[in-house]
Amino acid sequence: MTGLTNRTVVIDGRGHLLGRLASVVAKYLLQGGKVAVVRCEELNLSGHFYRNKIKFLAYLRKRCNVNPARGPFHFRAPSRIFYKAVRGMIPHKTKRGQAALARLRVFDGIPSPYDKRRRVVVPIAMRVLTLRSDRKYCQVGRLSHEVGWHYQDVIKSLERKRKAKLRVTLKHNRELKKLTVKARENIAKAAEPFNKIIKSYGYEV
């Protein structure tokens, strides 16, 4: 993530450990970068699922005893869980921290326009590279679903539609590429004298 630009870095959350990814994202935001994290429901948590569920249910019980409507408010959506993890690593009560958080976007699934953008991964936060193969882990999406998040089926449906649309697009692009190669072969002999002239001026054909 070196070389800051105004362009938003789109990170695919699938297969990343939540805390490790949050620390990398928090540091990048404080350096002035813009980040969008998609597919937060496929982030991973190390440890057995039931252990993580018990911890999260204990976290949900932390509320104002006099009037629970005062807060604190505990979000169930995977994207908001990740957002809060990042927020905890940033001085969010200062102007600098607020500006950093304003540069963060988090999403469940891959909404438009990020479905057409190049997505990257963070190797130092990926589960397959950082967690021992015999260690237990669980998905944030499953945890969220079991503690009150109601949109797991909606996100899965939207993801199926997106992947079906992507398969059609890729098939069309492959066919177009074949036609382009065939067209070049068909005109190769006729275009040879023109290519020589272009090359004489120092251009590559």
From Swiss-Prot:
Listed HAMAP family: Ribosomal_uL13
Protein name from the UniProt record: Large ribosomal subunit protein uL13
Molecular function in Gene Ontology: mRNA binding; structural constituent of ribosome
GO cellular component: cytosolic large ribosomal subunit; cytosolic ribosome; ribosome
A GO biological-process term: negative regulation of translation
SUPFAM superfamilies linked to this entry: Ribosomal protein L13
InterPro entries (UniProt xref): Ribosomal_uL13 (IPR005822), Ribosomal_uL13_CS (IPR023563), Ribosomal_uL13_euk/arc (IPR005755), Ribosomal_uL13_sf (IPR036899)
Keyword Ribosomal protein: yes
Keyword hit for Ligase: no
UniProt keywords, alphabetically: Ribonucleoprotein, Ribosomal protein
Gene label: RpL13A
Family affiliation: Belongs to the universal ribosomal protein uL13 family.
